[in-house]
């Protein structure tokens, strides 16, 4: 089973924990690792320095289009979400539109009152372990 890891790029501990604990059971797809295959450090530095501009447009396209292609190859989206992140919200919507299940790990429970997040989510979990226990039992991994 292929799982796309979604969430703020600041959530590095979540990504590390998931890969350390579950990469032998599931095929974990981390877009932050995948993006390194699509753009080089020089392109990334230009984007971070300038932000949106004509010269950075190609970099933005490579990032977003690559993430969308990676989502299409996955069986579900697992999202760690305690704060709003534009990219994360877009990934949720894309998965929803593709009928790919969306599972949100939200320890603070802050997202469980947002009608838009609820609408596009299959299930919420309080912890990483509870989410992956569900996936293991549901998908017989």
Residue ranges and their predicted role:
Residues 1-141:
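Conserved catalytic or regulatory cores that recognize and/or transform ribose-phosphate-containing ligands
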């Amino acid at each position: 089973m292929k799982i796309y890891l979604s969430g703020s790029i600041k959530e590095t501990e979540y990504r590390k924990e998931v890969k350390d604990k579950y990469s032998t059971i599931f095929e974990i797809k981390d877009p932050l690792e995948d993006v390194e295959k699509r753009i080089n450090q020089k392109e990334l530095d230009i984007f971070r320095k300038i932000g949106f501009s004509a010269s950075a447009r190609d970099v933005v396209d490579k990032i977003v289009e690559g993430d969308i292609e990676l989502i299409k190859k996955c069986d579900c989206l697992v999202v760690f979400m305690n704060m709003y992140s534009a990219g994360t919200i877009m990934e949720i919507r894309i998965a929803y539109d593709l009928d790919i299940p969306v599972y949100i790990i939200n320890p603070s429970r802050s997202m469980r009152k947002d009608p838009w997040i609820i609408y596009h989510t299959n299930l919420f979990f309080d912890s990483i372990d509870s989410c992956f226990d569900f996936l293991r039992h549901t998908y017989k991994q």
